[in-house]
Amino acid sequence: MAIETKSKINSLLMNIIPGGILFSEGLKKQGYSDQLMKQYRKSGWLTSLSKGVMYRSGDSLSALAALASCQEQTGKQYRVAAHSALELSGYYHFVPMGKPHLMVASNEPRTPQWAKSDFFDMTIEFFTTSAFGLIQKQAIKQNNYTVQASSPELAFMECLLLAPNRYNFMDLYYIMEQLTALRPAKVQQLLETTNNMTVKRMFLYMAEKANYPWYKAIDVSRINIGTSKIQLCKGGVYVSKYKITIPRELAEYE
């Protein structure tokens, strides 16, 4: 019995994503009982992170590896999103003040308890939204694992959705200046299916201002931007074409 237990823990430790975490619900499906997992913790092989979640004792926890572990073991529809997804796609490097944040989009209202831990290399920040009728995802290969993330087109729109509370519009335009290779068909799909008028109008305004070739391939006549005025800031500049009041700094930037 002891030999079997050691063989199972060796197999488990060999297959865990470096820096990742383990979910008891996934382990049970692989034949690991609650009693066996308790024995692994008692023996010091595994350490509890939160209820039903463990990691290999002594590991430095990676937020990305943990998210990949969750996607793989539980099937949760979490994905790397917003500026974090843009970083993974190589489009943008966000320089944080203090500990970096990993933005995660979820279809569940609550942040899982394990994601609130301070043990990760990044602060994991969850958000939920029903603004996008079409979710464009991509699988991004990391060192020893693959993680699901928003497409670059969706990721930038997620940034716009979270502005101005999470992001500054001027900073987002600096990102737009790097998005030289967005795919117009993907952009078209997202703009036609999102129900958020601010996202539609600000994306179109910024894309037109940047004057990329891909913008010229978008059929704006198929995109409903609504009729009501939107004020994004006080003391800004009103853009009549898109019926939005934007920061003066952005309007005057060339």
Model-derived features: positions:
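Residue-level signal for well-ordered alpha-helical scaffold segments within enzymatic catalytic domains
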Residues: 39, 84-88, 155-159
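Long, compositionally biased
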Residues: 67-72, 119, 207-211
